[in-house]
């Protein structure tokens, strides 16, 4: 009789354990399912991608970013963003891409655009300083600190204007262009086309800048005169050591 009672208690305890285990398993599976659903339906954010597919579901708007003063100048600069929102699988995707730059001259109380049309996207805008290593734009902009700001003499740009690989997107996988402008943004000029990869740049010496890039699977270097905005020489690197 006692053995039957003991067996009965053990069976009840096992039933409770099995029930608790089942509930925990259900809760775990439910949490996993909720996580998967949230991940599948959330809005994904990407940068420097423009969707050019003929899709009525793509919602686009432009937005001007924050104005920041250019070091060594009273002129301010701000990016123009193209923001696209479109369906992606079970959720949505939002892309933010820089299409242009606007400048403001507080002395003349006027604003102007770097390019006459806002198309394609800018992958980078690099501020160049005289007789020193180039610095990222956000590091040379005027700031409230005791250090003397380094004047910017020009900007170097890497941009993409066309969908060259026909994937219905404009991004860094397409062929690029390399361009320059003066520090005030009033003399924008594209100097190099059909760039597969931007490989870097040198310090400015005697108002000249060397730009390294890949084109036709070959690494090349272009020497640019910043005053005339012309390429004074262009050569290839040897493909063999």
Predicted regions and their residues:
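A short beta-strand motif characteristic of beta-propeller blades
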Residues: 112-113, 187-191, 233
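Extracytoplasmic/periplasmic/luminal assembly and interaction segments
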Residues: 64-125
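Beta-propeller blade signature
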Residues: 100-104, 174-183, 225
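Conserved beta-propeller blade repeats
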Residues: 121-156, 194-212, 231, 238-241
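Surface loop/turn motifs at the tips and blade-to-blade linkers of beta-strand repeat domains
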Residues: 115-118, 191-195
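Acidic, glycine-anchored loop motifs typical of Ca2+
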Residues: 163-172
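Hydrophobic membrane-insertion alpha-helices, especially the h-region
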Residues: 13-35
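Short extracytoplasmic/periplasmic juxtamembrane "stem" segments immediately C-terminal to an N-terminal membrane anchor
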Residues: 44-65
